[in-house]
Amino acid sequence: MAVHKVSFVAHLLVLGMFLLLVDAKACTKECGNFAYGICPRSQGTPDDPICTTCCAGYKGCNYYSANGTFICEGSSDPKNPNVCPQFCDPDIAYSKCPRSEGETIINPTGCTTCCTGYKGCYYFGQDGEFVCEGESDEPKSCTTECDPRVATISCPFSGLVKINQECINCCNADKGCELYDNDGSLICTGGEPQSAA
């Protein structure tokens, strides 16, 4: 009877592992054949303005003047861009988009496929037609600067630790780790989106 119970538990364990594997995202190693990709990203600065218009600007991106005044939200869908006049709006200096770092136009795309392409990036075939939006999360890039406010860190796996020579900030802290200042106030939790300070 004990053998049947062990066998049943073993089958449940194997089934659970199978379901985890099926649920996990695995991309094939085949290469895509994209001509280019578009990833709407923040561009320009008050001192180094971009050349665009509200018509040509990407949906989801906000456009600002050099003094920080909101001008407009872009109205062009990267999957089906607007046909717009070819001039620069002198009022627009920079944009703020959900994605901030990296190239806006990806060309060449290398071995990118729909599966390995980044979410929020749009990929186009050799004929210029929209193929797909990427499905993978883009790796987070963190600054290497130390946050001088951090005095202690509490991680679920290690407990409370005093920070001495360790260089840490809200971006590079392990997921779930809470960073505290000298007063014991929570600064942030690692692995969570941080608001711009």
Curated annotation (Swiss-Prot):
Signal peptide: 1-24
Protein name, entry field: Proteinase inhibitor type-2
Similarity annotation: Belongs to the protease inhibitor I20 (potato type II proteinase inhibitor) family.
Induction of the gene: Locally induced in leaves subjected to different types of stress (TMV infection, wounding, UV irradiation).
Molecular function (Gene Ontology), one example: serine-type endopeptidase inhibitor activity
A Pfam family this chain is assigned to: Prot_inhib_II
Lineage: Eukaryota, Viridiplantae, Streptophyta, Embryophyta, Tracheophyta
Keywords: Disulfide bond, Protease inhibitor, Repeat, Serine protease inhibitor, Signal
Sequence repeats: 24-80, 81-140, 141-196
InterPro entries hit by this protein: Prot_inh_I20, Protease_inhibitor_I20
Site entry: Reactive bond for trypsin: K29, E30
Disulphide linkage map: C27-C115, C31-C111, C39-C121, C51-C88, C54-C72, C55-C84, C61-C97, C114-C132
